[in-house]
Regions:
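A short macromolecule-binding patch
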Residues: 22-29
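Canonical P-loop GTPase G-domain recognition
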Residues: 113-164
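Charged helix-capping and loop-helix junction motifs
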Residues: 92-95
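Short aromatic-glycine-enriched beta-strand elements
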Residues: 12-16
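Helix-rich effector regions associated with P-loop NTPase G domains
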Residues: 29, 35-52, 58-77, 82-83, ...
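Catalytic P-loop NTPase motifs of RecA-like helicase/translocase cores
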Residues: 87, 117-118, 142, 216-219
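A conserved segment at the C-terminal end of the G1
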Residues: 166-182
Length: 293
């Protein structure tokens, strides 16, 4: 039996890197009977059948699980946003960051295309937030050294809306990837996703990146009762203030004596971040247990 990590799952096959080789594996039927599937990022026990093939026999305990995109054991979610066309909506960033926080992941926001827009509204917002933010350019290489340092020694999942240059950034980090790069439509102001499946790549030194299909894949199960119950905790800027609110159970939406609202008014919490919180709160407030899939 060998131990390895799943780097790719495609058409019923799991590609497991054991350190010595990559095995093309099938999963035992017991996984299907137990209602679970091995995921990219999983550490697994595999039986080597020879000829580069094997069977996944067991999945080791996971530190976290994302069902969409299907990946496990993510240390850090790297959100790629665009400082130029197509400019990323702050709500999309905040929504994904909230899900990552719920899953126990670190979050890193990277604003690509900084060579095209130096007066960046997104940077103004997030440089005053609790989310770490980098300005980078896949075109010029600006900020990529800082990005490499920020992802070192971690399993990082990269995501971003179409057209932000995710594949271009990954190609700069690991040139041998040769990931396809799409173009941004001038008419629509958005790109077309070129990533079709989740795949893990090793950058060396214990650093790994997972390329995911993008923001749209993060919807559904993650937006559930658990996020509803812990929503304020997923906005780290709120942490210094939530225990100072006048009322226990304050929702930080409209209550008198809410210290979070006062911090927003005072400029200590970015108003844009709080607007995203309110939008998420409105989406989740009426969700009931029987509605959870």
């Amino acid at each position: 039996m060998s131990r390895g990590r799943i780097e790719k799952a495609l058409s019923g096959f799991y590609y497991v890197n054991t350190g010595a080789e990559t095995l093309q594996c099938r999963a035992r039927g017991k996984f299907r009977r137990e209602g679970m599937s091995p995921l990219v990022g999983d550490w697994v026990q595999v039986r080597d059948l020879g000829g580069g093939e094997g069977f996944v026999e067991a999945v080791e305990p996971r530190r976290n699980v994302f069902s969409r995109p299907a990946a496990a054991n993510i240390d850090q979610l790297v959100i790629l946003a665009s400082a130029a066309i197509p400019v990323t909506e702050p709500y999309l960033i905040d929504r994904i960051a909230a899900i990552a926080a719920l899953k126990g992941c670190q979050v890193l926001l990277c604003l690509n295309k900084c060579d095209l827009n130096t007066a960046d509204e997104l940077y103004d917002i997030y440089s005053h937030s609790a989310l770490p933010v980098l300005r980078i350019s896949a075109e010029t290489g600006e900020g990529l050294a800082a990005l490499r340092a920020a992802i070192a020694g971690k399993l990082n999942a990269f995501t971003g809306n179409s057209g932000v240059g995710k594949s271009s950034v990954l190609n700069r980090l690991l040139p041998e990837l040769h990931l396809p790069v799409g173009e941004v439509s001038k008419a629509l102001g958005r790109g077309r996703h070129t990533t079709r499946h989740v795949e893990l790549f090793a950058l060396g030194g214990g650093t790994y990146v997972i390329d995911t299909p993008g923001f749209s894949s993060f919807y559904t199960e993650e937006m559930d009762l658990e996020l509803k119950a812990h929503l304020p905790e997923t906005f780290p800027e709120f942490a210094p203030y939530v225990d100072q609110c006048r009322f226990t159970g304050c929702t930080h939406t409209k209550e008198k004596g809410c210290r979070v609202l006062q911090a927003v008014k005072d400029g200590d919490i970015p108003a844009s971040r709080h607007r995203s919180y309110l939008r998420l709160y409105d989406e989740l407030k009426d969700l009931r247990a029987w509605q959870k899939k």
